[in-house]
A protein has these predicted regions:
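Peripheral/terminal regions associated with large enzymatic or DNA-binding modules
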Residues: 1-194
Length: 194
């Protein structure tokens, strides 16, 4: 359905809210999670592994005016560091391609992914044990997964679900400066105790 629609960047399998109450089986968001996603070659063709977009002063000015939170500024600095080291990092080239092209991500309204990569011996992506993970994030990582039911109920319009994004940012502790600090302090205390 969206293979040739350049407004769509990828299809995610993970819903950070486990279940999100809406009329449809999926929604559109400006960001999604990495576990269990699919994309198309047309999206990979937008990736700039030399980070040359950082040298485009005019477009970077527009970009930074739109994405101007503290997290956005830190991510931009991370991107510059990746450019300086001369090594492409998938996360940054992928994210920037999506944002620079104003693309949206498809998110299922029920989580379809069961992630068992944290707290497992010889894990590929994490050396943390389960007791080192903040309970709030553990809940996010180990939430139940559900089967997709057919026929799929498609949204009528391609429009970002801003309410979903706000709830997602809250769950991740990134919705406000105060909440971000609270989550960081809680995480630090948790790690000291464990």
């Amino acid at each position: 359905r969206y293979e040739y629609d350049t407004r769509i960047n990828r299809i995610c399998g993970m819903c950070n809210l486990e279940n999100y109450d809406t009329t449809y089986d999926y929604l559109f968001s400006s960001a999604g999670s990495g576990p269990g996603f699919a994309t198309w070659k047309r999206v990979a063709n937008l990736w700039d592994d030399t980070y040359s977009f950082l040298n485009n002063e005019y477009d970077m000015h527009k970009f930074q005016a739109k994405y101007n939170t503290l997290d956005d500024k830190r991510y931009h600095e991370t991107c510059k560091a990746h450019q300086a080291e001369g090594k492409a990092h998938w996360e940054t080239i992928y994210s920037y391609a999506c944002q620079l092209n104003s693309q949206l991500v498809i998110i299922p309204t029920r989580n379809l992914v069961h992630n068992n990569g944290i707290g497992v011996a010889n894990s590929t992506h994490s050396d943390l044990t389960l007791d080192q993970v903040l309970p709030q994030l553990r809940q996010l990582t180990y939430q139940p997964s559900y089967e997709l039911s057919f026929p799929i109920k498609h949204p009528l319009f391609i429009l970002e679900d801003v309410e979903y994004m706000q709830k997602r940012l809250h769950v991740m502790g990134r919705d406000s400066r105060t909440h971000r600090k609270y989550v960081k302090i809680k995480s630090l205390i948790w790690r000291i105790r464990h």
